[in-house]
Each structure stands twice: as structure tokens, then as C-alpha cells.
């Protein structure tokens, strides 16, 4: 029968879903609440279809959840926060009350109704007791039954009104949560450089996860209760005085004493929370930097350095969180002890003043106290949350008022062809005004790009006036003539015409310019319309500052800028989204297939698409992690080209590609499809200067501009610069011959290797239609996926998750704590029994003092167990929290690179921010509430059955109904909450990506698109939160009805009981557990939801490690040359490297990136690695560091298979200057020598060799001066110089130079090459380069093509070999330079 009923229900509720096509757009399904009947709205029956689907059809999926009601969508709610008055006190809180709470008056009404019913229900009990005490002759069944119904209705009304209060409060919570998150994201898109130094992506994520969460928690319930509860408490106390007379004032006095204590404790709780959040911000900042720079940390074997820094902040955070927990425990103790002491004080005073304790007095008063308990317990909680809201509000307000980019156009255009500009003139208000950057609307008529009398600085004017700059080091500028490298002074570009470095202002170790010294001072600039303007200059001369001034990314102190409205900009370190290659090129523009194909061809991407599994639909990892540097630059260039703007500003777009590809890009892009447009090219590759219509040389912030002949008259000697680049084959022939004679035994003839023709030439005739399809192929798209879906467990949170959590604390101690909760509740229930015995003592067998004494003993014992259980719970949860974070951090730190390729940083940071925050702040309270409420309900139910066994029959039926309801509920509620947690990750991921690409997003005016993307992500997350809360109310209403029935059956059974006192106790207990039963289920579900955070953290803790970290952990000893043990502190001693049949795949299912590579490098050889961009050169280099493991073959260093060496020892033994240098926040010393291994003299010597000593020595704190995350403000070349100084200092026997000078001008590169030759002469060195002049004198050259080693020999032999690919590259570059010199 039950089986048939189940099948009928399944058919009834699942037929429509079974008939739907899998591709149905469920997001477009309207919210079922919109079309619900009045009864369905009243009972939340409109959620049942979803609940049945989750129970009968398996775990809920996103497609099973309907749309969010329009009233709750963020695009509707966010505009209400546009008019915040920041001049008032607590402006954000006031705005939410004004805009959201005032529109939700029914929420206020329900809270008032709850207060009124809580006063009426004790009166119903009073009259019921009067009836019970009547003689049988005076009782009438109808009147008794009527009183039972009244008790049922009063109980039901009280609990149902609480449920509706929660529901209507949810609307305000959703509005606040969505609107604030959206406003934070919109503000992020407008942050100035100063604001970015104060708020990195980790800080902003922490604000959203913690502070916005505080608003969400407060405004779903506490925002009205904090005002209603005091009046409710006062009304109940008046009623108490009416029942027990002036004795009630004694109880009131106890409460009055407790209120300031609770308020004081709540203040302490908020203070410690505020301090802990500050450390949490720092921890999240460091974690964000750690994740963003993880590959560099692994290459340098610096993981432990950052782990220690993060753990230091974590320890400080936990210190204040533990203090907060102590104050919270004291607050809860005082609250619960007060409720007990009020009973003791009131009843003792009442009895000792000569009054007779009767049933109606004692239990009516007890019911009043039961109704008082919730507001009494929740008022301090509400006050605590309100006080916690203040620091969160302040943090959000500070962020929303942080400085904005000075010249930020709105998306709306005006008829006068000007754009409205948002200009942040002060820190209090964002004022709309018209900027002096004139942006002309797009038209067919081009105009000159100009800067008129422009003065620019990286700091806002307020900072310059006040002299206070926080942690700002803009880098190091080399100040000299273009051929003079002797003079160097501070400031990437942070210098004007003055060379006085002592007029700056010192703060936090950095020298800042005074108001009379700027990055660019009173400059005039012109880029002729429709012409090519080339900007050149040595590293740190001010080129990036000039470009930033053009696009409005640097503070303009004075002057004006005239630039077209629609510009395209490519950064030196390209910004790529974690989406398909195609979407990165389109960048929000509609697809024009004809133009798209031309762009692909012009940017020389066709050969690269051939190598990608899904061609242009291939998913690009975060920051283009699965692409080479050249591929990333060309995709960025393709995006600019496809946008078809009036003006193109290109910052070093050709530095990471080989000469042949660079020429192709220059001819087909810059001089091809961009022809007749205004082009501004920043480049170190001076061979392109002859093609320029206008040239600008930047030197120490000073601009010299004109045509080539005009600049030559001014003393700019381009010819001498070009001579440093020319490849003299004859000289190299001689040097190579000498080298070959010495090492002829190690060379292998190129004739023994495969020959290769130019991949570029071989694809020219290829039909691009075979590569790019106009229709999206689902199979290709699925094949192109790089990011994995976020893990999501199904079903209830398993016992193993709980066991693992308490294993981190103490499992045995937890069981003891559970026992203490039940023991303390039994003791408290015994006090009620004792009170019943007291009131039933009509013969006065004992005086009142006797009963008072034992009543106090029960209450005292309850208090003792209360204190112990709370402190034990705090000890367990804090130990677990500390251990979970530590294990999570270590697991992520030592995970493989593939883990970071397939999981965006925002998703990972979500574990460290929101999930850890839930574990830190909520789990202790959740476990405490569940155990307290659960023990109260269990003990009370057993007591009621013991007193009135008759109710066990209806109880059994209600238990079955209760079981069915909670099974239906939990099957869906947990899944909804899991999906809600998962849908938070895209919010954080988009925020992280947008933050990293702010310059690109703003230049392409893509703010509106990104805002809409964020709105979509937030709405999806709110949608899950909305339905999760809705099913809470569905189960809540049904459980409240069950508890009301329990009251009815208990009261009805009491009509037939002979023991009046215990019958009244049973009814009173039933009334008391009404709210507790529902609160127990709610807290159990909330606990299960929050345990999902533990589940998510545990899933990352189980992440496979990349390999054995220390050699000592290997089971087998390494046998090398007959020796069993090795001293790896001195390995490698020679530097001999050998690749044997090496094959490398980045993913098991991917095609090999390197195929059967075999070659040997003798000790002290310098090997040049060349090849087309994307050919696999960098893969050869990083394979030495085991950043990706060999799928076949082996690599040996000094005869040792590196797969048998611990990763730490291996990477620590090698040196590297990476292609994309990364600078970490901290001091200069920390970035060069993080473990304090070297003396100051050694560090200064290394800095002198890379031409940075003068710059750093001019800083007041010198080596202790600070730099920002990723070296913001340093030019690309300056970062490379710092990385080079690390490697020189390390003095490894094997060194990898991966495009180590790609961001440096040729003069500096020539000097550094001399430095490299001098300092690495005794090392084995692999140099990956596109600049052939940097590797032409190498011992041997390895040519890589399509992942294969196609040539490997001395430069002389390769040049002599007909058809050699290397010879073609050399001849191509040499001919190009000679042709360029002829043009000069």
C-alpha cells in the first residue's frame, strides 16, 4: 500500500519533468510563487514540486530550480544604494533601512504579532490550570476541549508568525546581500591605482564573503527584533508582576543587571571580531598572492616562505577569534543563567514573603519565563550582530568611498560627442563632472591624439599634498641618455625633469615625490591621426606612465588629453579571461566571421590553432596559463585588431615572438589591417622605427619627439643602437669554431636530426575554414574544456565528514561534551519536577526554605555543567578550525600545477575566505545550538511521555509524519545549499579576473558587460539561497503544526489525568518545546549546510600532491656512480644535463607538448633554445623543474634521474629567470633573499651587476624598502632585472633563462648579456630567446618545432648547413636589420 502511494506521489509530481527535453531552459521558468494560490502561499506549497523532484528523481540539479522572483534580482535592488549619504553616521545601514526595510512593512507587522501572541498564550495556560484544578462536578468536557483548542491555536499562531517573520525578513536580506555585492563589484571596476594598493582582490573577496555575509545575517531577522524585543520583554514582565505581584520585580531586577553585562560582552565580541577580520584580510591577501604566484614559488622552492607568512597571520586571527569565543560563551552563559536565576529569585521572593506557591502561579509564571527566554536570549544576540555589523559596514563604506580612476567615462553618450566622466574629487562622494580628457565619439574623421601641458603622477593629489603614501613603490627608473647606463635613480617612471631624489617624502620605506616632482611633468605629446607613432626608451624611462596617461590610468595633475572614444589597448602582460580563445578575441563584440578569419590570419594564429585540440574553441586557463607568452600576446593583439577601433595603443606586443612572426605581425596587423588608423606602438625592437611616421623617445620622464631626421639632429643615435643588435655571423663562426674544437666530442650533426620547414610558411596556403567553424560543435566545446566542474557531493553530509572534523579537534572530548549537554538539560528539567513537587505540597510537609534550597542546588549544578560544556565545545571547534586551515593550506601549496590550471583562483580563494570563515565563526554556535535545543526536546519528550503515557500513541503517529517531512526536506535542502556554495565561486572568480584586467576592461569600455555578467552570477547564487530558505519555511510551518498538535494532545490527555500537578507540567513543557523543536530542525539543517564548508575544505585537503617533496622520503636510495648516498646540498656539482626520449603531456588526455626529445648538455655549456612561438621551448625549460612530469623518458642532471630527487631539493638547486617575472609584496630584501642566506655585501653586489644598486641605495630604507604585489608600478623589464639578481645571488650550477631580457631595451640587454657571461661562465645555462643576438654565441643551439627537437648543433655548423631552420632565422633577422639600417 505504501509502495503504491509512493508511486502515485512520484507520478503526480514528476510527470512534467520527465517529459521535458534535457535542453530546456529552466532558468527561464518563472518562480512558482508568482502563480501560486493563496493557500499555497500560506503553506509554501509552491515549493513541493521541487522537493518531490529532489526526493524521487535523485539529487536536485540547477535545471530543477526555477528563476528568482524579479523583486529580488540584483539589477532591481542595486540602484537603491546609489544615493547613500556618506556624511551621515552609519550611512550604509541607514540606506538599507530606508530603501529595503521601509518597503517591507509586513515583516515589522509579523514581529509585533509574535510579541502580542507571546503575551496571550500564558493567559490561556492560566485558565487551563484553573479548569484542571476544578472538581469533577464543575468541569464540562466542551469547555475543557475549548481550552485545549485555544492552547493549540495560541501555540500555532506564535510559531507560525515567527516563520512568516523569517520569510519576510528574507526579502530584506536578499536585497541587501545582492545589492551590496553588486555595488562592490561596480566600485572595483572604478578603482584608482591608489585604491588598488589598499585593496587587492583577496581583500575585496574577504569583504564580500565576511562583511556582506554579516549584513545578510542581520537583516533577515535581527534588524526588527532588536527594536521589538525590549517592548516584548517589558510587556511580559508586566504580565509576570500581575501573576506574582511585586516578586516579579525581583526577577526583573535580575534581568536588568544582566542587560549591561550582555551589552558589554557584545561590545567586546564585536571589537575582537573587528580585529580578527583585519588579520583575516591580511591572510586572504597573502593567500591570494600565494595562489596567483604559485608557479613562481614552486620554481624557486619558496612555498614554505609564504606558508609561514600566512600561518603567522592565521595565528593572530585565531588569537582574537578565541577571545571573541570566550566573550560569546560568557554572554550565552549570562543569558541562560539569567533565565534560571529569574525563576529562583521570583519564586523564592514570592514564597518567602508569605505567599502560597500554587500551580496556576508557578506554571503560568514559568510559561511567561519560557516566552521570555527567546527574546532574552536573542536580544543580546541581536545586539551582538548589530555591533558586529558596524565594523563590517565601516569596511564596506571605506571601500565604496575609496579613490576612483580620475577619468572614467560612463557608457551613455551625449549628443555633443562628449562622454560624461565620473571624477572622484574627494573620498566622500563620487561626483559626476566633465573631465579634461576629451573623448570624441567614434566617427569616420580621425584626429590627433594629444597631451597638452600634462602633468601626471601615480599618486592622487591628496596623497602628494599630505605626503602620505601607503606601501607605494612604483619601481626603479634608469635615468640616462639612451646610450648611457651610468646614472640610475628611483621611481619606475616616477621621475620628472628633476633629477633630485632627495625631495621625496618617505613612508613605509619608499621615497615619494613631493608635489613639485611628478612622473611626467608638463609634457606635450602628439600622435598624428591615421599614422604610426613609435614610443621607445630604455627600461624604466617612463613609457608605461606615458601610455597610462593617455588612457587615463594614471592621475592627471594638470593639463588635458585628447583621445578618441573607442580605443584598443594591449598590455605587455596580456589579460586573458578563463574562457575560449574565440571569446577572448571577440571580447563581447558580435561575431563577424569574415573579419574574424582575417584577424586570425593577420595575427599568425592559424598554426597555433592547428595544435589546439578544439581549435579556437579551446578553453584558455586563468591568465592564459596553458599558452606560451607569444600566443598570449598575439591573442591580445587579435582582440585589439578585431575591435576595429579608431586608435590602437600597443605596449610591447612583439617582445615574446620570434623575428619572423614579429615581422608578420608588423606587416599584416600594425601596417596592414590597422592601416589608416591612429597607432601608438611602444617597443624596444628598434628595427621597426624606420616605418614610423612619428617617433617619441622617453628618457627620465622627458619626451623628445619628431621624425627620424629631426631626432637625429637632436643627437639621438639610432645607428649605434642598431649595431648592438646586428648578428655578425663571421665573428660567431670563429667563436663557434673554437668552441667546437674544444667540445667536438659532445656535438651531434644536424644532418642526423629531422629537417623542418617554416611552420609559418607551411600554413599560408591552408584554408582557414577547415580550422574555424561558424557553428559551435558541442563535441569540440566539450573537448576544449580546461576548467573542471567544482566538486559537489550528493545526498546528506556523511558521518565521515563529521568524524573527520572532530578528529581534528578531539572525538572523545566531543562525545563527553554531548553527554554534558544532556546531563545539564536533565538537571534543568529536574528543577521543573522539583517545582511541581513544591506546588503540590498542600500539607506543608516541608517549609519553603527546604524547597528553595534544593531548587537552588539544581540551578547551581545546571550552571556548572553549562560553563564546562561551552568551554569544551569552544576548545574542540577551535582546534578543528586551526587544523583544517593548516591542512588546506599545505594541500593547496603542494598540489600539482594541473590543479591550478583546472581550478580558477576565485574558486580556490572561496575555500580560504567563505568556507574558512563559516568554520571559524559559525560551526561552534551551530553545534552548541543543535545540542542545546536537541537535548531540550529529547528530555522534554521523554518527560511528557513519562507523565502522560496516553500521548505516546499520537506521538508515534506524529513521529512518522515528522520523519517523512524531514526526509523530503533534507533531501533537497542540503543539495540546494551545496549548489548555493558552488555558485559563490563564479562570483569570486569573475571578481578576481576583472580585478586583474581592470586596465583592459576600462580601455575597451566593457564595464557594462562585466557588470551584467556579475549580475547574472549573483542572481544565480541568490536564486539558490532563495529556494533554500523557502524550503526551510515549508518544513518549518509543518513542524510548527506538529508541535502545536503535541500541545493539543498533551492538554487533551491532561483532561483525563488524576495527577493535576504533573499534567500541568506536561502541558507547560509541551508549550516550551514548540519553538525548540522547529529551531532544532532548523539548526540541524543549518549545521549540515555549514558542514558543507568542512566537506569542501576536506575535498581540497585530499588533493593529490605533485610529487615527493624531500629526497629523504624516497624508499629506495639513489644509486649514482656506485655510490649509495648523496649529499644533495652540493648537488649538482658539474651541471651536466641529459634528456632521454622525453615526452611531456600537460594533461593525460592531451596531445604531447614534447615528443621524444633526446639531447645532452655538457657541464658549463650554454645552450640556446629557439623556435616559433608556441613550439614548446618553455616546456623544455620547466621540465627541468618537474613543473610537469615526463609521461615518457627521463631527464638526468649529473647522472641523477631527477624524478628520484625531491622537488624541494631539485628546484632549490636550479636557477631561473622566468618569462613572466613575478614580484611578491614585502621588502626588496625578501624578494631577493627570502631566507636570509646572504650578507648585505653579496646582495648589493648582485644588484650592482643588474644595474639596480644605485636605485635601491638611494632609498632611505634601502633593502628594507617595500614593493607591492606583483611589483605593481615596476615595468616589465625592471621585474626581469630583479629576478635576474635573485639568480646571480643563488649561483646555481644549472640555470634557465626563459626570455630573460624580452622586456629590456637592447642597450640594457647588451650590458646585461656581458654580466650574464661573466657570472654564469661556470654554469650550465639554457637560454630561451627570440632575440637571436642573445644566443648566437652559445655552445649549441636547439631548435624546437611542434614539440620536437629538429636541430641541435653548434651555431657555426647550423649556419653552414643548407636548409637549416636556424640559418633561415639568422639570415632573416640579419637581412631585416641590414635593411633597417639602410632605411636610416
Swiss-Prot record:
GO CC annotations on file: membrane
Biased composition (Low complexity): 735-756
GO molecular function: ABC-type transporter activity; ATP binding; ATP hydrolysis activity; ATPase-coupled transmembrane transporter activity
Spans through the membrane: 112-132, 140-160, 226-246, 247-267, 333-353, 813-833, 852-872, 941-961, 1036-1056, 1061-1081
UniProt domain ABC transmembrane type-1: residue ranges: 104-388, 814-1093
Primary localization: membrane
InterPro entries documented for this protein: AAA+_ATPase (IPR003593), ABC1_TM_dom (IPR011527), ABC1_TM_sf (IPR036640), ABC_transporter-like_ATP-bd (IPR003439), ABC_transporter-like_CS (IPR017871), ABC_transporter_C-like (IPR050173), ABCC_6TM_D1 (IPR044746), ABCC_6TM_D2 (IPR044726)
Region (Disordered): 729-756
Keywords: ATP-binding, Membrane, Nucleotide-binding, Repeat, Transmembrane, Transmembrane helix, Transport
Gene3D superfamilies: ABC transporter type 1, transmembrane domain, P-loop containing nucleotide triphosphate hydrolases
Membrane topology per record: Multi-pass membrane protein
GO terms for biological process, alphabetical: culmination involved in sorocarp development; transmembrane transport
Entry's localization field: Membrane
Binding sites annotated in the UniProt record for ATP: 537-544, 1171-1178
Domain ABC transporter span(s) in chain numbering: 505-724, 1137-1371
Family label: Belongs to the ABC transporter superfamily. ABCC family. Conjugate transporter (TC 3.A.1.208) subfamily.
Protein name: ABC transporter C family member 2
Annotated source species: Dictyostelium discoideum
Upper lineage: Eukaryota, Amoebozoa, Evosea, Eumycetozoa, Dictyostelia
Amino acid at each position: 500500500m505504501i509502495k503504491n502511494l509512493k508511486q502515485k506521489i512520484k507520478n503526480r509530481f514528476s510527470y512534467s519533468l520527465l517529459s521535458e527535453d534535457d535542453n530546456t531552459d529552466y532558468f527561464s521558468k518563472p518562480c512558482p510563487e508568482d502563480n501560486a494560490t493563496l493557500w499555497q502561499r500560506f503553506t509554501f506549497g509552491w515549493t513541493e514540486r521541487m522537493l518531490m523532484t529532489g526526493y524521487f528523481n535523485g539529487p536536485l540539479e540547477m535545471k530543477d530550480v526555477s528563476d528568482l522572483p524579479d523583486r529580488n534580482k540584483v539589477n532591481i535592488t542595486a540602484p537603491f544604494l546609489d544615493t547613500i549619504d556618506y556624511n551621515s553616521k552609519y550611512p550604509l545601514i541607514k540606506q538599507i533601512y530606508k530603501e529595503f526595510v521601509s518597503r517591507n512593512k509586513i515583516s515589522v507587522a509579523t514581529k509585533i504579532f509574535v510579541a502580542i501572541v507571546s503575551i496571550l498564550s500564558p493567559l490561556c495556560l492560566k485558565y487551563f490550570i484553573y479548569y484542571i484544578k476544578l472538581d469533577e462536578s464543575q468541569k464540562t468536557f466542551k469547555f475543557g476541549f475549548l481550552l485545549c483548542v485555544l492552547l493549540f491555536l495560541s501555540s500555532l499562531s506564535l510559531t507560525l508568525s515567527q516563520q512568516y517573520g523569517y520569510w519576510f525578513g528574507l526579502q530584506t536580506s536578499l536585497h541587501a546581500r545582492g545589492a551590496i555585492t553588486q555595488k562592490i563589484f561596480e566600485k572595483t571596476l572604478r578603482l584608482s591605482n591608489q585604491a588598488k594598493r589598499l585593496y587587492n582582490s583577496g581583500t575585496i573577496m574577504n569583504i564580500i564573503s565576511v562583511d556582506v555575509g554579516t549584513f545578510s545575517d542581520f537583516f533577515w531577522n535581527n534588524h526588527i527584533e532588536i527594536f521589538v524585543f525590549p517592548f516584548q520583554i517589558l510587556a511580559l514582565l508586566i504580565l509576570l508582576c500581575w501573576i506574582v505581584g511585586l516578586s516579579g520585580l525581583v526577577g526583573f531586577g535580575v534581568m536588568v543587571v544582566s542587560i549591561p553585562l550582555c551589552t558589554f560582552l557584545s561590545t567586546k565580541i564585536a571589537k575582537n571580531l573587528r580585529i580578527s577580520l583585519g588579520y583575516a584580510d591580511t591572510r586572504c591577501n597573502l593567500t591570494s598572492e600565494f595562489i596567483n604566484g604559485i608557479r613562481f614559488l614552486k620554481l624557486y622552492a619558496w612555498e614554505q616562505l609564504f606558508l609561514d607568512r600566512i600561518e603567522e597571520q592565521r595565528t593572530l586571527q585565531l588569537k582574537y577569534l578565541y577571545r571573541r569565543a570566550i566573550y560569546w560563551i560568557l554572554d550565552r552563559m549570562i543569558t541562560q543563567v539569567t533565565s534560571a536565576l529569574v525563576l529562583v529569585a521570583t519564586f523564592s521572593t514570592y514564597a518567602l514573603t508569605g505567599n502560597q506557591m500554587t500551580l496556576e502561579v508557578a506554571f503560568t509564571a514559568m510559561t511567561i519565563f519560557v516566552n521570555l527566554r527567546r527574546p532574552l536570549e536573542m536580544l543580546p544576540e541581536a545586539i551582538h550582530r548589530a555591533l558586529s555589523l558596524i565594523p563590517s559596514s565601516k569596511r564596506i563604506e571605506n571601500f565604496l568611498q575609496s579613490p576612483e580612476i580620475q577619468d572614467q567615462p560612463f557608457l551613455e553618450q551625449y549628443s555633443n560627442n562628449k562622454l560624461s566622466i565620473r571624477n572622484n574629487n574627494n573620498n566622500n562622494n563620487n561626483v559626476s563632472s566633465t573631465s579634461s580628457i576629451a573623448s570624441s565619439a567614434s566617427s569616420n574623421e580621425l584626429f590627433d591624439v594629444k597631451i597638452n601641458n600634462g602633468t601626471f603622477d601615480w599618486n592622487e593629489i591628496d596623497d602628494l599634498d599630505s605626503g602620505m603614501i601607503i606601501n607605494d613603490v612604483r619601481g626603479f627608473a634608469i635615468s640616462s641618455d639612451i646610450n648611457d647606463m651610468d646614472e640610475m635613480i628611483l621611481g619606475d617612471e616616477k621621475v620628472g625633469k628633476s633629477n633630485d631624489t632627495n625631495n621625496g617624502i618617505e613612508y613605509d620605506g619608499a621615497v615619494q615625490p613631493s608635489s613639485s616632482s611628478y612622473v611626467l611633468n608638463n609634457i606635450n605629446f602628439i600622435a598624428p591621426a591615421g599614422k604610426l607613432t613609435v614610443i621607445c626608451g630604455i627600461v624604466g624611462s617612463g613609457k608605461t606612465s606615458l601610455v597610462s596617461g593617455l588612457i587615463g590610468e594614471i592621475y592627471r595633475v594638470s593639463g588635458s588629453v585628447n583621445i578618441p572614444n573607442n580605443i584598443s589597448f594591449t598590455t605587455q602582460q596580456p589579460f586573458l579571461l578563463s574562457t575560449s580563445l574565440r571569446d577572448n578575441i571577440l571580447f563581447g563584440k558580435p561575431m563577424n566571421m569574415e573579419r574574424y578569419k582575417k584577424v586570425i590570419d593577420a595575427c599568425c594564429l592559424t598554426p597555433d590553432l592547428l595544435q589546439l585540440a578544439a581549435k579556437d574553441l579551446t578553453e584558455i586557463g586563468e591568465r592564459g596559463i596553458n599558452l606560451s607568452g607569444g600566443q598570449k600576446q598575439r591573442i591580445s593583439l587579435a582582440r585589439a585588431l578585431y575591435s576595429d577601433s579608431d586608435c590602437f595603443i600597443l605596449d610591447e606586443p612583439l617582445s615574446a615572438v620570434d623575428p619572423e612572426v614579429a615581422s608578420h605581425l608588423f606587416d599584416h596587423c600594425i601596417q596592414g589591417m590597422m592601416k589608416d588608423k591612429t597607432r601608438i606602438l611602444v617597443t624596444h625592437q628598434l628595427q621597426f622605427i624606420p616605418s614610423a611616421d612619428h617617433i617619441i623617445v622617453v628618457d627620465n620622464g622627458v619626451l623628445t619627439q619628431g621624425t627620424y631626421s629631426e631626432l637625429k639632429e637632436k643627437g639621438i643615435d639610432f645607428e649605434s643602437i642598431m649595431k648592438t643588435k646586428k648578428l655578425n655571423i663571421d665573428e660567431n663562426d670563429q667563436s663557434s669554431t673554437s668552441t667546437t674544437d674544444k667540445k667536438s666530442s659532445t656535438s651531434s650533426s644536424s644532418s642526423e636530426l629531422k629537417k623542418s620547414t617554416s611552420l609559418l610558411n607551411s600554413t599560408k596556403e591552408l584554408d582557414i575554414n577547415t580550422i574555424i567553424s561558424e557553428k559551435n560543435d558541442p563535441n569540440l566545446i566539450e573537448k576544449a574544456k580546461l576548467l573542471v566542474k567544482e566538486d559537489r557531493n550528493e545526498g546528506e553530509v556523511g558521518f565521515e565528514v563529521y568524524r573527520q572534523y572532530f578528529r581534528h579537534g578531539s572525538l572523545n572530548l566531543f562525545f563527553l561534551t554531548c553527554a554534558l549537554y544532556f546531563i545539564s538539560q536533565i538537571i534543568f528539567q529536574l528543577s521543573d519536577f522539583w517545582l511541581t513537587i513544591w506546588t503540590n505540597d498542600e500539607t506543608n510537609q516541608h517549609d519553603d526554605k527546604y524547597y528553595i534550597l534544593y531548587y537552588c542546588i539544581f540551578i547551581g549544578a545546571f550552571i556548572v555543567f553549562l560553563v564546562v560544556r561551552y568551554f569544551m565545545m569552544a576548545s574542540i571547534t577551535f582546534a578543528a578550525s586551526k587544523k583544517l586551515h593548516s591542512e588546506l593550506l599545505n594541500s593547496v601549496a603542494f598540489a600539482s600545477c594541473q590543479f591550478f590550471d583546472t581550478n580558477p583562483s576565485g574558486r580556490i580563494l572561496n575555500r580560504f575566505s567563505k568556507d574558512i570563515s563559516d568554520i571559524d565563526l559559525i560551526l561552534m554556535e551551530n553545534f552548541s545550538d543543535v545540542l542545546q535545543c536537541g537535548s531540550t526536546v529529547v528530555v522534554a519528550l521523554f518527560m511528557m511521555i513519562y507523565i502522560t503515557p496516553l500521548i505516546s500513541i499520537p506521538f508515534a503517529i506524529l513521529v512518522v509524519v515528522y520523519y517523512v517531512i524531514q526526509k523530503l526536506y533534507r533531501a533537497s535542502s542540503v543539495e540546494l545549499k551545496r549548489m548555493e556554495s558552488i555558485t559563490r565561486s563564479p562570483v569570486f572568480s569573475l571578481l578576481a579576473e576583472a580585478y586583474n584586467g581592470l586596465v583592459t576592461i576600462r580601455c575597451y569600455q566593457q564595464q557594462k558587460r562585466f557588470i551584467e555578467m556579475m549580475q547574472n552570477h549573483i542572481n544565480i547564487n541568490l536564486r539558490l539561497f532563495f529556494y533554500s530558505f523557502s524550503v526551510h519555511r515549508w518544513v518549518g510551518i509543518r513542524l510548527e503544526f506538529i508541535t502545536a498538535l503535541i500541545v493539543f494532545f498533551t492538554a487533551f490527555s491532561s483532561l483525563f489525568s488524576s495527577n493535576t500537578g504533573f499534567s500541568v507540567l506536561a502541558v507547560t513543557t509541551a508549550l516550551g518545546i514548540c519553538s525548540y523543536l522547529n529551531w532544532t530542525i532548523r539548526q540541524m539543517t543549518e549545521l549540515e549546510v555549514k558542514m558543507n564548508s568542512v566537506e569542501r575544505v576536506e575535498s581540497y585537503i585530499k588533493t593529490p600532491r605533485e610529487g615527493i617533496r624531500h629526497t629523504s622520503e624516497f624508499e629506495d636510495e639513489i644509486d649514482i656512480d656506485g655510490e649509495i648516498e648523496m649529499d644533495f646540498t652540493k648537488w649538482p656539482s658539474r651541471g651536466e644535463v641529459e634528456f632521454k626520449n622525453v615526452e611531456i603531456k600537460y594533461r593525460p588526455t592531451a596531445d604531447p607538448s614534447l615528443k621524444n626529445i633526446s639531447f645532452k648538455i655538457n657541464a658549463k655549456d650554454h645552450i640556446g633554445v629557439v623556435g616559433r612561438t608556441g613550439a614548446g621551448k618553455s616546456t623544455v625549460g620547466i621540465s627541468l623543474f618537474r613543473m610537469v612530469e615526463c609521461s615518457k623518458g627521463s631527464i638526468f642532471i649529473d647522472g641523477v634521474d631527477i624524478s628520484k630527487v625531491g622537488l624541494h631539493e631539485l628546484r632549490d638547486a636550479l636557477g631561473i629567470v622566468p618569462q613572466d617575472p613575478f614580484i611578491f609584496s614585502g621588502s626588496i630584501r625578501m624578494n631577493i633573499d627570502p631566507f636570509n642566506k646572504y650578507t648585505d655585501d653579496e646582495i648589493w653586489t648582485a644588484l650592482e651587476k643588474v644595474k639596480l644598486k644605485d636605485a635601491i641605495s638611494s632609498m632611505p630604507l634601502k633593502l628594507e624598502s617595500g614593493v607591492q604585489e606583483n611589483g605593481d608600478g615596476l615595468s616589465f623589464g625592471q621585474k626581469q632585472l630583479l629576478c635576474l639578481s635573485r639568480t646571480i645571488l643563488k649561483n646555481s650550477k644549472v640555470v634557465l633563462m626563459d626570455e630573460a631580457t624580452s622586456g629590456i631595451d637592447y642597450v640594457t640587454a647588451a650590458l646585461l648579456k656581458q654580466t650574464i657571461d661573466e657570472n654564469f661562465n661556470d654554469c650550465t645555462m639554457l637560454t630561451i630567446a627570440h632575440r637571436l643576438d642573445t644566443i648566437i654565441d652559445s655552445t649549441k643551439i636547439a631548435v624546437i618545432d611542434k614539440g620536437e627537437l629538429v636541430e641541435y648543433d653548434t651555431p657555426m655548423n647550423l649556419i653552414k648547413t643548407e636548409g637549416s631552420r636556424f640559418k633561415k632565422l639568422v639570415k632573416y633577422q640579419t637581412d631585416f636589420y641590414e635593411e633597417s639600417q639602410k632605411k636610416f
